[in-house]
Amino acid sequence: LITLSGIIGSGKSSLTKILADELGTKAYYEPVKDNPVLPIFYKGNEIAAKKRAQGDKEATNPYAYLLQTYFLNRRFAMIKKAMQEDNNILDRSIYEDEIFMKMNTEMGNATEVEYDIYRSLLHNMMEELPYAAHKKSPDLMVTIKVSYDTMIERIIKRGREYEQVDQDPSLVDYYHRLLKQYDVWMQKYDASPLLIIDGDKYDFVANKEDRVSVLETIESKLLELGNLTKAQYEQLQQAHLDLLK
């Protein structure tokens, strides 16, 4: 299992598809549609913010914990499906979901007790057991690291209104804080080998040379880990040469 991680607008979904097409495996995307909790979560944020502005310093969003456990459950179900075949690609990591629960807690939308319970649940779910038939962590975690400017440029390009800083200026601070949390998360991550891709340097969507460079970096790591045979690796290398002709 190969898992893609990275902040909003980093290019996770694009690289997930590129990599799955390259390896001939299945892509499993972040569950964002048909989410019954998301609308009431956003409404809960508004209500909690108004209450805090009126002096209720303890006001939280009653749906913050619910939303994150919903994502946790959906993500774990995706892991079980993706694990059924070698080198399937997962769009977003269950591990990085903790970043968003932590952010909700720091912003006052969730309580410290809720965060501790969520964190304990995540760790219990993902704990590797020596007698289990399969492990739950990925064979390789690929993280796309981007700067604030690159993130905003891509957010504008894809045009989701609720992500735009000109629609909601408070997102500027939120995005900067989120970038810092991702930096901390990358430094602490130890559940599997981690490969960091420079999303500022490589435009793997629009530029063929950049795409090949990123693919070769990932595939070299997969060869090293034993997820690709030498013959498979050489076949992919030849395909890259053909692409660049």
How should these model regions be labeled?
Residues 4:
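Hydrophobic anchor at the beta1->P-loop junction of P-loop NTPases
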Residues 7:
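P-loop (Walker A) phosphate-binding loop of NTP-binding proteins
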Residues 12:
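Conserved lysine of the Walker
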Residues 15, 19:
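Hydrophobic positions on the alpha1 helix immediately C-terminal to the Walker A/P-loop
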Residues 21-68, 73-74, 99-103:
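Conserved substrate/cofactor phosphate-moiety recognition/catalytic segment
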Residues 59, 63-134:
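Glycine-rich phosphate-binding loop used to anchor ATP phosphates in small-molecule kinases
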Residues 100-180:
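A glycine- and Lys/Arg-enriched "phosphate-lid" helix/loop adjacent to the NTP-binding pocket
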Residues 156-245:
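NTP-dependent small-molecule kinase module
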